[in-house]
Regions:
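Active-site loop/oxyanion-hole signature of alpha/beta-hydrolase fold enzymes
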Residues: 48-89, 254
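Catalytic active-site module of serine/aspartate enzymes centered on a nucleophile-bearing elbow/loop
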Residues: 232-269
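Conserved alpha/beta-hydrolase catalytic His-Asp/Glu region
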Residues: 123-125, 143-198
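Short beta-strand/loop motif that positions the catalytic acidic residue
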Residues: 202, 208-210
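Gly/Ala-rich beta-loop-alpha elbow adjacent to hydrolase catalytic centers
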Residues: 90, 94, 98
């Protein structure tokens, strides 16, 4: 489905009924990335998927923008579908938007789930983004600069056939000049992002997940989130990289649904 935000077409999907769960994509993801997760995540919940500006089936923008427009698109979506509040999940780039949305619209968020994300674009992450941008001259260069480091080394090695299939799909996509131009704008939209001094303003129940081999948003950044967000819990996943949803899909789904659908928050033991 499409709704209009200003002059942009924003694509979204709704699956199932129940307590609403809104999923915010990582930077290279789209609503299609969640195909294998729709069935379990919509069994007891209204699952809401959305492509950010520049992603998937939403409009592309080749002039530079920043996170604030993505935050406003999330709010416009909830107004469009007339949902007063949601459980909000964000992974990586989507987690950054989720944090800013929660700070701006705290009454809209029942629970917050942050996976493999951070409170600021560090010098490290900015240089990673610069490396991605410098590799956009060819599909294979972009693939080799981005994809291997999203996964843990063990997963990458042990799933060579799966990775080669992904490579065959992604390299032609990364050769598309409009795609990589849009990706550069998305990557640069995170420059200057920093909410570290605002994290103590978040009061909603929050689950934070970090992984042992996350080379994009290292675990110390999830630890920082946990240290500064009151009423937050931190889960450390061994033997996984940045793309936990693909490396450990069953565990990932169990964590999300267990946290979202557990109605008991305080235990007096």
């Amino acid at each position: 489905m499409i709704f209009k935000y200003k002059d942009y077409d924003i694509y979204y999907e709704i699956h199932g009924q129940g307590d609403p769960l809104l999923i915010l994509n990582g930077i290279m993801m789209s609503t299609k990335s969640w195909a294998e997760f729709i069935e379990p995540m919509s069994k007891d919940n209204m699952l809401i998927l959305v492509d950010f500006l520049g992603q998937g089936q939403s409009s592309k923008e080749y002039e530079q923008f920043y996170h604030d427009i993505q935050v406003d698109i999330v709010e416009a979506l909830l107004q469009h579908i007339n949902i007063p509040s949601v459980h909000l999940f964000g992974i990586s780039y989507g987690g950054e938007i989720a944090l800013q949305y929660t700070l701006k619209h705290p009454d809209r968020v029942k629970k917050l789930f942050l996976s493999n994300t951070c409170a600021n674009t560090s010098y490290w992450l900015e240089e990673v983004g610069n490396a991605w941008n410098e590799a956009t001259h060819s599909g294979i260069s972009y693939y080799l600069t981005t994809i291997p480091f999203i996964y843990s080394p063990k997963f990458f090695i042990n799933n060579r056939e799966w990775m080669e299939n992904r490579k065959n799909i992604l390299v032609p996509l990364f050769d598309n000049k409009d795609f990589v131009k849009s990706m550069k704008v998305l990557t640069n939209s995170s420059v200057g992002y920093d909410v570290r001094d605002k994290l103590d303003q978040i009061n909603v129940p929050t689950m934070i997940v970090g992984c042992e081999y996350d080379f994009v948003t290292p675990f110390y950044q999830q630890k920082e989130l946990n240290d500064k967000i009151r009423n937050s819990q931190l889960v450390y996943i061994h033997d996984s990289g940045h793309a936990i949803m693909y490396e450990k899909p069953s565990l990932f789904t169990s964590l999300v649904l267990g946290f979202v659908n557990n109605s008991k928050i305080m235990y007096n033991l």
